[in-house]
Amino acid sequence: LLVLALGAGAWYMWQYHWRTLSIEVDGTAYSAKADTTVAAFMRDHRDFERKPGRLLSVEGKVLEPSGGNTVSVKFDGKQIEPADWDHTRFEKNGTLTVTPGTDLTEEHTVEQRKVPFKTDINLNGGPVQIVTQQGEDGLQEFWVGRQSKKTAAKTVIRKQEPLIVKSFAPRPEGKKVIALTFDDGPSIYSDKILDILKQNKVKATFFELGEQSLEFPKVEQRIVREGHQIASHSVSHPYFPNMSAQEQRQEIESSLSDIKKASDVSTRTFRAPYGAFGVDEWKNNATLIDRNVLWDVDTLDWKRPGEKQITKEVVDYVHNGAVVLMHSGGGDRSQTVKALPEIIKQLKKKGYSFVTIDELCKMAGL
């Protein structure tokens, strides 16, 4: 019995402790006792020069050179987790596959944030500024690192669409047309202007102030009835660059509402007071209007230079597609009223016909 016990003990020690195994790594055979743990084997061979991965911030910067995933070990294709290395022994000959650790990104929170739309606004091409594409905010995923406290932009969920505004100088091919426009009305002079236009079978565009529209609703209704175009010139003629975005929007929204109430016309055509409407104003208000119409022939009638000078400014500088600025309100417009018949007469003599802003844009394919 003693001999059997000693023999069994010797066999056990040989089988599980003294026996030499052949462990192949990277094509090279290494010897290891049967009681060698994976941890000891890796330590004895310096992890076969494999390194753990790095711990990276959400921005991809190294926070800890060895803070990433540990070296990966497989024995005959079976994964051995790092937590099991200390109590996993080799029981047979085999192949150990050792893979460097992979990088690990720090723990982080994931947020979805609005990405404000960009702008592509060119206001140097002519007097008619048109929205060709509305801006739309994008949506993007952002990671906020718990260790680094940094924020990194990641997956784009919805791409932002830029606000595109282009400006044009309408020149209808094969035509000789002109757009007469009147600002600051309606007023006590509006009916006189409308009488002249009617007598001469001429159409025009009226950029009206909301507060004036409410005061003269019958004039607004006559403008529409006789085939002219009504558009907005704000409520009270403020200087937009000095206003907050909220104030600007309120001014335009109120003017559109006033015009609708007085004339039953819904318009998205606008002329900024003083022509002061730049990139910031477009960014603030592009969802309210489709066009901002300036001018390229200015009569300067608001200075009251005399009816002959007002007429001369138009006749001397007229061209196909011209947008002429005149005033039907905002002060004494008697000179404008007196000049208008002669302006129409001379322009007709030159072969011009008269159109509204809507008609001009349509003729020019805008």
Ranges and model annotations:
Residues M13-Y30:
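Ser/Thr/Pro/Gly-rich low-complexity linker/stalk segments immediately outside membranes or between
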Residues D26-A32, V58-E59, P82-W85:
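Short, recurring structural edge motifs at helix starts
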Residues G60-T70, F75, W85-A179, I188-D191, ...:
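N-terminal pre-catalytic segment of deacetylase/amide-hydrolase enzymes
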Residues D76-K78, G101-D103, G185, E211, ...:
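Solvent-exposed coil/turn segments that connect beta secondary-structure elements
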Residues A152-Y239, M243, E247-D258:
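Active-site beta->alpha N-cap acidic-glycine motif
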